[in-house]
Amino acid sequence: MKKVSVLGSTGSVGKKTVDLLSKRKEEYQVEALSAHSNFALLAHQAKLLNAKYVAISDERLYKDLKESLLGTDVKIAIGATNVAAIPVDLSVVAIVGIAGLGPVMEVIESGTKVIALANKESIVCGGKLLLKKAKEKNVQIIPIDSEHNAIFQILQNDDKCVEKIILTASGGPFLNYSLEQLRNIMVDQALSHPTWNMGKKISVDSATMMNKALEIIEAHNLFNISPDKIEAVVHPESIVHGIVTYKDGFNFAVLAETDMAIPISYALSWPERLVLNYKLDLTKQGKLTFQEPDHKHFPVLKLSMEVLNSSTPQTNSIVLNAANEIAVNEFLKSRIGFLEIVEVVESTMESFGSYTDINSLSDIINIDCESRIIAHKIVESKVVAYS
């Protein structure tokens, strides 16, 4: 029986993971679960999966969680890092944002040998530091993002003579919108993705295509591939998740339905495969289309390449991610407009001036904090100007 932990179990990916695990209790023993604030769902999941440990990040909800688990033997902690330190066979990390970086590092140190990673920000910001530590500890990182999961599967079979990798993007809900239409986007519109069912933050990132920008940086770090060998194409049907082009002209692609249960199950069962009832019928799909991204409407893809080709790519990656997290949060509060998300990111990167060597987790956190302060000031200036 495989021992598993799920960090971020109440988010969209976490809930999918819990659902899969609940149907295979004879194969998986869930040691630990963690959540940010949804104590009621966390308690329900703990009972459902007979988890031994749970952690809540918002310490104000500790008593509520404790009351919800009265009569059980579940041990309760505050903060995901406390349960991340529990060694398991496989840890699923589905925490949103850079908040997942510390727990990922803790999992690597714990003795856990496989990490199923849905937290792209830890790879984007942790970069070489995180991956070096994983290599030292002999930890296998399996990406859950469907695009990187696809590339991972292909490269598992053949990682030599790679010409380029292609990450597909749905284009989000505003693919064919004019700039004037984009200027007037409301929050509920940005949360309505045409092909994927996702959380709020990643839905907005998909709408701005920042999700793909972060994935380009993630692919560079995760697969150690030069930026000039990474390409993004718009594929509205979202059936082809990733393509690897080899030097002899052959292209290998991974195709699957648009359900996160598929890459999650791959990560849970690796190096084996689970039996799932997701059968792709291309005759019913009808057509698969691809097109170049519109960089005028969605400038963040070029921004990610500028980051990777800069003299300080890791620092700039951290700044990019931090500013985006602040901007998306302010957009979700309706304090800034849709197009202003990218404006805040660009202005933050232009204003950031502290470049230091990154040798520790604290170095990353310091850059992240400074970037957030700058981004907040830029947001406030826009709010004042708007009002």
From Swiss-Prot:
It comes from the Bacteria. Keywords: Isoprene biosynthesis, Manganese, Metal-binding, NADP, Oxidoreductase. It is an enzyme of class 1 (oxidoreductase). Its EC number is 1.1.1.267. NADPH binds at residues 10-13, 38, 119, 121, 199. InterPro entries: DXP_reductoisomerase, DXP_reductoisomerase_C, DXP_reductoisomerase_N, DXPR_C, DXPR_C_sf, NAD(P)-bd_dom_sf. One of its GO terms (molecular function) is NADPH binding. Its cofactor is Mg(2+); Mn(2+). It catalyses: 2-C-methyl-D-erythritol 4-phosphate + NADP(+) = 1-deoxy-D-xylulose 5-phosphate + NADPH + H(+). One of its GO terms (biological process) is isopentenyl diphosphate biosynthetic process, methylerythritol 4-phosphate pathway involved in terpenoid biosynthetic process. Belongs to the DXR family. This is 1-deoxy-D-xylulose 5-phosphate reductoisomerase. The lineage of its organism: Bacteria, Pseudomonadati, Pseudomonadota, Alphaproteobacteria, Rickettsiales. The gene is dxr.
